[in-house]
């Protein structure tokens, strides 16, 4: 599938009559509240946006005319929430200190936007599965140590479970109900505990960023989950950052190390390969 993680945000806002012609820059001022949540649920059965429907149509064509395995794509709930809130970091930190949504409007905004995100993402992945997707690539790059304090988590805070895992579980259950596998991608910087938590979702494939050492992460991930990655594609834009020879050496080492630990593995990039406009010329 084409990687466009702005589709869900645009569709969500359109269903609520918000965002205008620049949905990518729209941010809620305060918590959307129960009225917005109810409005979204009432309108979820409306047709998907044209780009979302086009992806579903492509999946159906693959199912009906090829022997390829159709795979869909969507953004993760936490990552979508961070695109809807002006400052998600402070409320999450306050929640990590023990405050609740009833005590802080910022936490309420994060909580409400997560609920909106789960609703529209669940609708989208179910539509993709109905169109023929056998698996969904769910991209959750914002679930990382920038947004979620490792120190707070180490001290017993449940912020990773509350804001990342619980929404992901709801999407995972929707995929299970639709008989579609989860391919989970998170290229953010993660702790061992975060990796283990993500692996507990039992994804068919877990794709991680180049900050992780995959042959060490193999001990955190069940053998039923294929590890994917994690060549540093964010540095591929310039030979001054990394050369072709260095990438080849990294790939060879990854293959050798993963064979040694015996974990199912697919060599690939940590994320999408950045494109420089005009490079095709």
Give each language-model segment a name.
Residues 173-281:
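Catalytic-face loop-and-helix region of soluble metabolic enzyme cores
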Residues 1-31, 41-48, 135-158, 269-270, ...:
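Glycine-rich, proline-tolerant flexible connector loops at the mouths of alpha/beta enzymes
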Residues 4-6, 28-29, 74-89, 134, ...:
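Short glycine-enriched loops at secondary-structure junctions
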Residues 95-108, 112-144, 154-155, 161, ...:
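Alpha/beta enzyme core
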Residues 18-127, 155-159:
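Active-site-proximal, glycine-rich beta->alpha crossover segments in alpha/beta enzymes
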Residues 51-55, 114-121, 164, 168, ...:
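Aromatic/hydrophobic pocket-lining residues that form the small-molecule binding cavity
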Residues 14-17, 87, 151-153, 199-201, ...:
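Short low-complexity, flexible loop/linker segments enriched in glycine and/or proline
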Residues 1-3, 70-73, 131-140, 181-187, ...:
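Short beta-strand segments at enzyme active-site cores
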